[in-house]
A protein has these predicted regions:
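Histidine-centered, transition-metal-coordinating active-site segments
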Residues: 1-79, 83-89, 96-97, 130-357
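A generic, well-ordered mixed alpha/beta core segment in the N-terminal half of proteins
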Residues: 99, 103-146
Length: 357
């Protein structure tokens, strides 16, 4: 008995007509034998979860670099929140949850250390530019390895959803599946709401600082705002689809306009605020110096990046190497390379009286 076929049949019988069915997938770059239990999107989800790039997200910054507590979001917890929000919206629209989950869990695996500070400086240092959504595709198709081959060989729908989850750059257009479009809106809902929460925890923001007219529309608490946005996305998208006017996931005009204003407020007040900018400057300094070091000493990188350098140029190989680092690993490398180290680490134990007392 092939369980996968039962699941695929259930999708055909139960999912919405506009959902992306596993049996309709455009396939993988390299054809594979189907899994007997899992659909193609289940396989993709599992490959992403078990990848090294996914595990490293737990040590990558969301907004605040090296926050002084255990409850601030990391890039991994952000990813999990996006996944939860997206699956709720997907369920409300009767979409393919397995595809949604694969895209959600993989959407940020190409993010740099130090959040968007790392992305910004690499974009300035590389002549061809750097975008984290495009880099997520590079990680999943070139850097990660499976069965001695480069890349995880994921389905086209998963890669497309990851590539188009961000509304910036040359790939700012929407994903071609509604499941992929769900990730874009879920990403925004997640980061704006949890960044407000973390900013309040850090003492950088009070709820009263947010314009009251935004809160009156979206909600005064974290859970209220999230519920408003998720519920509206489901209701408005269903309304548009039923009217056959639009097959695109979105928010109603009032909610969309208010949410845009709230995001703009967060950019001005927090993301581009003095505290975050000071840390961004330090983080960019570290990455720029590591980038210059590895351009001069490419042999210090693993053989995989030597192959990338031969095929696509040294700049791209160094960017791939650095973008995969965690925040802590970046800092430790910088210390090892640029900060003088004592030749006798236990000197104070050997000579406790240094003559200064």
């Amino acid at each position: 008995m092939i369980i996968r076929k039962e699941i695929e049949k259930r999708e055909i019988n139960t999912l919405a007509a506009y959902a992306c069915l596993a049996v309709d997938s455009k396939g993988r770059n390299l054809p594979e034998e189907p899994d007997p239990i899992r659909t193609c999107y289940m396989v993709d989800r599992d490959r992403i979860v078990h990848s090294k790039s996914f595990r490293r997200l737990k040590h990558k910054t969301q907004v605040f670099i090296a926050p002084p507590g255990d409850h601030y979001r990391s890039r991994l917890t952000h990813t999990l929140e996006v996944n939860q929000i997206a699956k709720t919206i997907g369920a409300g629209l009767n979409l393919n949850i397995d595809l949604i989950e694969a895209i959600a869990l993989g959407h940020d695996v190409g993010h740099t250390p130090f959040a968007h500070a790392g992305e910004q400086i690499l974009n300035e240092l590389i002549s061809s530019g750097f975008r984290h959504n495009e880099n997520s595709i590079r990680v999943l198709t070139k850097v990660e390895r499976r069965k001695n081959q480069n890349g995880l060989n994921l389905s086209q729908e998963v890669l497309d959803g990851i590539l188009h989850h961000s509304g910036y750059g040359t790939n700012a257009n929407q994903a071609y599946t509604l499941e992929g479009q769900v990730i874009r809106i879920s990403d925004k809902v997640a980061y704006v709401q949890h960044d407000i929460d973390d900013s309040i925890r850090a003492g950088l923001l009070k709820i009263d600082d947010i314009p009251r007219e935004y809160l009156e529309v979206l909600g005064f608490t974290h859970s209220q705002r999230k519920a408003t946005l998720v519920t509206d996305a489901i209701a408005y998208t269903r309304q548009q689809i039923e009217a056959k006017s639009d097959y695109e996931v979105g928010l109603s005009p009032l909610i969309e306009q208010t949410f845009r204003k709230l995001r703009a407020f967060m950019f001005e007040y927090i993301y581009q605020g003095s505290v975050c900018q000071a840390e961004r400057t330090r983080a960019m300094f570290i990455i720029e110096h590591l980038f210059n070091y590895y351009k001069k000493h490419p042999a210090k990188m693993s053989p995989l990046y030597k192959q990338i350098a031969d095929e696509e140029g040294l700049e791209r190989a160094v960017a791939d190497y650095i973008s995969g680092m965690s925040d802590g690993y970046c800092v430790e490398l910088f210390k090892d390379i640029y900060i003088p180290q004592s030749l006798v680490p236990d000197a104070l134990k050997i000579f406790p009286d240094d003559g200064l007392n």
